Design a protein with these regions (language model features):
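Short non-domain terminal segments
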Residues: 12, 36, 67, 96-99, ...
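Structural microenvironment flanking redox-active thiols in thiol-disulfide oxidoreductases
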Residues: 14-79
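Residue-level detector of conserved, well-ordered beta-strand and adjacent loop positions
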Residues: 6, 69-70, 113-114
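Thiol-/selenol-based redox modules, centered on thioredoxin-like
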Residues: 81-84, 88-130
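Amphipathic alpha-helical repeat scaffolds
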Residues: 7-11
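Proline/glycine-enriched tight loop/beta-turn segments at coil->beta junctions
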Residues: 1-3
Length: 130
């Protein structure tokens, strides 16, 4: 599967990117795209809720149907090993919510995208490797 891995937050100015992520998922899930969303409270304390509250928010506000994991840290001593690998491959620490990482079918890092890069702006990169 092609993976788009994203650190997310419910109370961020970039939270509306959930819509773009869901649109990408709807469009490409049958071609092998999986979106893996990891809530994180490390940036501006913008993900204060419990895992259940986060899931309810995503379901009711954005109708999210892609994988939403439990809240984690993405930087620092308690960072998830997955995000340690991703930031090593990308060559930089995560600066804010909604940082995205594209992984090909072989499990290889393709590239990272900063917070400001909207999901629809990375569609061409997904199409090229799916």
């Amino acid at each position: 599967k092609t993976l788009l891995i994203v650190n997310v937050a419910s109370a961020c100015g970039f939270t509306p990117q959930y819509t773009g992520l869901q649109n990408l998922y709807d469009k490409y899930k049958d071609k092998g795209l999986e979106i893996l969303a990891f809530p994180c409270n490390q940036f501006g304390a913008q993900e204060k809720g419990t895992n259940e509250e986060i899931k309810d928010f995503c379901d009711t506000k954005y109708n999210v149907s892609f994988r939403l994991f439990n809240k984690i840290d993405v930087n620092g001593d308690n960072a998830s090993p997955l995000f340690v690998k991703l930031t090593e491959a990308d060559g930089r620490e995560i600066q804010w919510n909604f940082t995205k990482f594209l992984i090909n079918k072989e499990g290889e890092f393709v590239r990272g995208f900063g917070t400001q890069k909207k999901p629809e702006e990375i569609e061409e990169h997904i199409k090229a490797i799916i």
